[in-house]
Amino acid sequence: MGDPRRLGKKYDTPNHPWIGERIQSEKEISQKYGLVNKKELWKMETQLRNYRRQARKLISDTTTQGGKEAVQLFNVLKRYAILVESEPTLDHVLSLNIESILERRLQTIVYRKGLAKTAKQARQFIVHGHIAVNGKRVTAPAYLVSVAENDAIEYVPNSPMASENHPERTAAVSEENQ
């Protein structure tokens, strides 16, 4: 059978580990979006870097194939609402920042919809299996939510959180109403 292949890393670490400005900005972003460690942030930064790298490559490509690839890139970014312009250009892709991707994580959307009081509580609800997307339980806080799935985020029906009078749920709803 052979050994299974070794999977490569899905992120790149910073070139220089001890730059104070970068550390401070990473800390602020981690607190704002409830990230547990820097690796989660680096994964999203690498994903953004790959989108931008592809856009830079496509700017110089004037063939019909380059046009098709640009349309495919726009479709992917629109599907996840990372790119919201109606007539996107490659310059729009180059102007994306890390927060545009972090806003599409399931953890952030659960918090923004008011299903949890904090981003960290949203993460806990997801990891513990209280959140469903399109009726399927999702336990990955970094799951990127597409536009089609945006309205289908809810509590799992057989979860204790689905009860209207659960203490944590009523606290989140009452704080949202104030």
From Swiss-Prot:
Database matches in InterPro entries: Ribosomal_uS4, Ribosomal_uS4_arc, Ribosomal_uS4_CS, Ribosomal_uS4_euk/arc, Ribosomal_uS4_N, S4_RNA-bd, S4_RNA-bd_sf
UniProt keywords, alphabetically: Ribonucleoprotein, Ribosomal protein, RNA-binding, rRNA-binding
Keyword presence, Nucleus: no
GO process annotations (BP): ribosomal small subunit biogenesis; translation
GO cellular component: small ribosomal subunit
Alphabetized GO MF terms: rRNA binding; structural constituent of ribosome
Alphabetized CDD domains for the sequence: S4
Domain S4 RNA-binding, first and last residues per copy: 104-166
Region (Disordered): 158-178
Function (record text): One of the primary rRNA binding proteins, it binds directly to 16S rRNA where it nucleates assembly of the body of the 30S subunit. With S5 and S12 plays an important role in translational accuracy.
Family membership noted in the UniProt record: Belongs to the universal ribosomal protein uS4 family.
Quaternary state and interactors: Part of the 30S ribosomal subunit. Contacts protein S5. The interaction surface between S4 and S5 is involved in control of translational fidelity.
Name of the protein this chain belongs to: Small ribosomal subunit protein uS4
Record lineage: Archaea, Methanobacteriati, Methanobacteriota, Methanomada group, Methanococci
Designated gene of the protein: rps4
